[in-house]
Amino acid sequence: MEKYEIPETGRVTVLTGTQEIKVVEEPIPEISDDEVLVKVEQTGICGTDVHEYKGDPFHYIPIELGHEGTGTIVKLGKNVTKDYYGKTLKLGDKVVTGLRPCGECDTCKYDAEHIHLCEHGEIFGLIPGEEAIKNMNGWFGEYMKINAGGVIFNVSDMDVDLRTLIEPTAVVVHAVEKAKEVFNFKHGSYVLIQGCGPIGLLLLTTVRTMGIRNIIAVDGDNNRLEWAKKLGAHYTVNFMEEDAIRKVKDITNGRGADMGFQCTGSPKAASTIFKYIRRGGSMCELGFFTNNGDTTYNPHLDFCNKEIKVTGSWTYQADDWVHAMDVLKEAQERGLPVTGLLTHKYPLAKINEAMKMNMSMQGLKIVVLGE
């Protein structure tokens, strides 16, 4: 059996104040029979990490951030033999991890398919406090401990860059599944995606793998719109350079989009999305994982007169992770350059630079290495 030499200490990144992360040494935690220790390979920076870095909305301090990570099992509790879907786990396997449901609330007891709505669930990398730091419960470090009850997936058949995109792709896969509750996707449907950051571009990729032939990407950055084209957008609209509402109407023969996905965290954008959608159309809001403020809309023009069907989307269910893996593999097979979204990689010691690069909007998905 493969055995790994594990040092006595490992580096951990700790958010200690607004826009201040320190890299510190902590003893490698012991694991119980129900826990797993992972050597981190790399972790994507999420918009939520950046919000925390800037001091909003939760202001979790101190905390070790990072929830889009992947790595190698180097120590395995004797009771942990299979992943969430029954795939065998062993030392050396590559893994990702999702939610850690509480197992006690009504959702966990009576509606296990919707563990993402667990009343007391945790996401590794968003667990504040000194205990979580000493447990290495975030992915921005050299090692990461998956506590008992954490959802684990064996993804040894995927390369490291593809694995790094599984968590955000699970977010958009869940949004597509929610959208199916209010919209019947057809190959000829006009599907509009507002916001071409990593989430919007991964959603675009997901919709493209569904065979949708009329994808409209809306953003104010030409570089991001170029990426939208690379990933399969049929039409692009730059709202900074043209009358975006008129352009969308022209593309859709005067009707408007059949289905719209709102992927930004901008309250203004959350209002504008309704203007793009046809009468009888549908919309899914997935851009607000933090409270960025209120928006305004006209109840007559935006809802009643159009009878727009609306749904919201929140994180993901366990099934969405498996679907996300399939989406990424298919995208790669189709030649869609999805791993090109990982535009910058930084060593652990330069995590503050990585955060500031993300804030500058110069890249797409910024990655922190576990070394």
Regions found by a protein language model. Give the residues of each.
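Glycine-rich phosphate-binding loop and adjacent beta-alpha segment
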Residues: 229, 267-330, 370-371
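Conserved amphipathic alpha-helix within the SDR
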Residues: 244-254
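C-terminal hydrophobic helical "lid"/dimerization subdomain
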Residues: 1-8, 271-275, 318-371
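A generic alpha-to-beta junction signature in SAM-dependent methyltransferases
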Residues: 183, 252, 264, 276-278
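Short N-terminal strand-loop motif that marks the start
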Residues: 1-75, 141-146, 371
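Glycine-rich beta-strand-centered segment in the early N-terminal region that forms part
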Residues: 29-43, 57-111, 137, 156-158
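Mid-domain Rossmann-like dinucleotide-binding core that forms the NAD(H)/NADP(H) cofactor-binding site
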Residues: 151, 157-241, 246
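NAD(P)H dinucleotide-binding glycine-rich loop of Rossmann-like/cofactor-binding domains
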Residues: 83, 104-194
